Amino acid sequence: MKSAEIREKFLKFFESKGHQIVASSSLVPHDDPTLLFTNAGMNQFKDVFLGFDKRPYSRATTSQKCVRAGGKHNDLENVGYTARHHTFFEMLGNFSFGDYFKHDAITYAWELLTEEFGLPKDKLWVTVYADDDEAYDIWTKEIGVPAERVIRIGDNKGARYASDNFWMMGDTGPCGPCTEIFYDHGPEIWGGPPGSPDEDGDRYIEIWNNVFMQFNRDEAGVMHPLPRPSVDTGMGLERVSAVLQHVHSNYEIDLFQTLIRAAARETGCADLDSPSLKVIADHIRACSFLIADGVIPGNEGRGYVLRRIIRRAIRHGYKLGSRAAFFHRLVPDLVTEMGPAYPELKAGQARVADVLKQEEERFFATIENGMAILETELAAMATAGSRTFNGETAFKLHDTYGFPLDLTADVCRERDVTVDAAAFDAAMARQKEQARAAGKFRMAMNLEYEGPETKFHGYERLEERGTVLALYKDGAPVVELQEGDIGVVVLDNTPFYAESGGQVGDRGELRGSAGIFEVEDTQKIQAAVYGHHGVVKTGRLAVGQELGARVDGEARASTQRNHSVTHLMHKALREVLGAHVQQKGSQVDPDKTRFDFAHTAPLSPEEIREVEDLVNAEILANVATEARVMSIDDAQKSGAMMLFGEKYGDEVRVLAIGSSKELCGGTHVARTGDIGLFKIVSEGGVAAGVRRIEAVTGANALRYAQEQERRVQGISALLKVQPDEVAERIAGILDNVRALEKELARMKSRLAASQGDELVAQAVEVRGAKVLAAMLEGADVATLRETLDKLKDKLKSAVIVLAAVADGRVSLIAGVTSDLTAKLKAGELVNMVAQQVGGKGGGRPDMAQAGGTDPAHLPAALASVKAWAEARL
């Protein structure tokens, strides 16, 4: 039975039971900001279940398009390497909105599976929530499923209702028990029944889940019976198709085989079992349906997820040898397969192909260079024996060559390498901060204005009255702004400082008799024309109105503290590090100061402390700040510091604060004591020869110090020592750790030797050579290597594969003694085993390594080594 027939039969069956066939909703959730993509059949009925929406039917059935490739539900990294992970899938479902309940839902499911689909009853197993006696009795007494095949699933670790068989929409709201139906693939496949220690195997596969919403959970965790219980069910079309078509992997069903053959045609790959073909076949579905539903590739949100999926598919095509756009040519094959069920896909076919082609061509323009960098880094790592890919390099690939992190991680995973995600995130955060600072309210020079200049009074006062000279909305001049309008106001007089010299623009309020305007930022439209950017909170504003302008005094004061301390810090850095220190950039806002400066080496803790001491000494001196306007020549003669490359006018403003004297047009404290306290919170490099310091002042510095004190006190409490003894105690602990690590290494070496002796007896003779494939409990890669070397010495002429499992990942190592490498290659052997456990690997003829993500298949993979070796000896 083909997938299309299964879909049709499911919908028609429930239609015959009084259900309304409802079209799939869009993959972009409607009015639900909590969801990135539609990921379940019940999403479109969420408000119906919550009682916020009413439908003209009380029973419904759907085949819902779903995507899981971002956020909490993210299957992307597993796609192509397991039998059942997909980015796009179809969820068949039937729903009851206060109509039928457990009896009918269970009866319908059993009738469809056993009578309509013809599944053998003895192949079906069932789970129910441990306390759901009603469902248990229906299954055992009415349906007649033997009690040994109906399994009660309890709460995880005793936490009430924390069970795989109890569904909750959230911490509060509708919830209830569920019953799941499993298909038994037979004893030839490893795995145990649900609830057993081996339940993660592939023998018993869940095909249908029936959720019974019968309670409403309140904030106290109390369950209240719902007056009209409901039913929400879901059955993956791909999973049930695999069962009905008598195949074990979803990728073997007719729907996927069509797309896999199409991908093979376009890439020239002859191996239809290639994981890369599976990736491409899966991803063309997700990408095409997302584009058809209005998502376009971008750099954030849904668009970024789409771009990641497209580029992952392209990378796998590149891996198979494609060097030009190929992915978009699969769209007609997909439309032929799925267009009849989803007319929106057929209607959008041309647009889908066009969007994919453009994205492909854009990425193919850079992928060659990006892959070269990636391969060079991996080769260098292999030489050095490193297993962690540099996060900065991963970010360069992302930023320069368009390689999303998960694409780089995907390539690394194939080599059993992990990416330093923390370093990547740090690089990303730095770039975002730079972009935010550079692009915030960029309205300068892009608004057309002809009129008087703005007179700035913000050095003397925070309040001023001014007349509206111009108004802008959506970048165009207007005569008035209405309540709720976002726009820009130009005044003839203002106390608001416009962003300049690294200091952010002021925020505050413009108030008139007819309306109030909240100023969110202030920027210069022209050199002496100030634009107040914000929103009309109440009433209206019109050109010619007189307004009272008031700056947010607290924000201005915080900004002034941070700006003034930046001058003092600059001076202190030159004293501590040398006269070569020059400002390369700054960003001053109410929260902190960020200062970039020329220097080649990281600051030592002692240098940071010295800078802090110098600045805080200036603060304690409480010296008055003096600002004077003078000619540029007089400023130079006075010794005022000027920034290299900066253009100055004939007249400049010179700020003297403490021992610092610089040209500056910003706002500052009246006395150094107003700064209160200065603390450096971070120091690091941002470019070759450029360092960055971030610092806080005043109340923010006090809060920072208090937080550090709290942390030290917490650590001292954990260590049961006084705060001033923490460092000594940690040093002692580290000494113990190092000693234990050395002892562990010695024990592992002894373990390898002892295991090697035990494993020798397990080797079997095949045509004059010894063949051994075994798993070592608790071993790491180093132990596997050491054990392999010892076994090769002991067995003399041998073919060996050793494996270990840790944190759900498989590590493999293969070895072939030198007398056999003409016939057998360790790289080919380890790759054969790795492919069976969801991985890939390679290496030298005599020794090779690999990794995998599917430990469930490891026993069978190891068992295949003997036959592989026998065929080649």
UniProtKB/Swiss-Prot annotation:
Catalyzes the attachment of alanine to tRNA(Ala) in a two-step reaction: alanine is first activated by ATP to form Ala-AMP and then transferred to the acceptor end of tRNA(Ala). Also edits incorrectly charged Ser-tRNA(Ala) and Gly-tRNA(Ala) via its editing domain. Zn(2+) binds at H563, H567, C664, H668. One of its GO terms (cellular component) is cytosol. The lineage of its organism: Bacteria, Pseudomonadati, Pseudomonadota, Betaproteobacteria, Rhodocyclales. HAMAP family: Ala_tRNA_synth_B. Pfam families: DHHA1 (PF02272), tRNA-synt_2c (PF01411), tRNA_SAD (PF07973). SUPFAM superfamilies: Class II aaRS and biotin synthetases (SSF55681), Putative anticodon-binding domain of alanyl-tRNA synthetase (AlaRS) (SSF101353), ThrRS/AlaRS common domain (SSF55186), Translation proteins (SSF50447). It comes from Aromatoleum aromaticum (strain DSM 19018 / LMG 30748 / EbN1). Keywords: Aminoacyl-tRNA synthetase, ATP-binding, Cytoplasm, Ligase, Metal-binding, Nucleotide-binding, Protein biosynthesis, RNA-binding, tRNA-binding, Zinc. The gene is alaS. The keyword Transmembrane does not apply. Binds 1 zinc ion per subunit. This is Alanine--tRNA ligase.
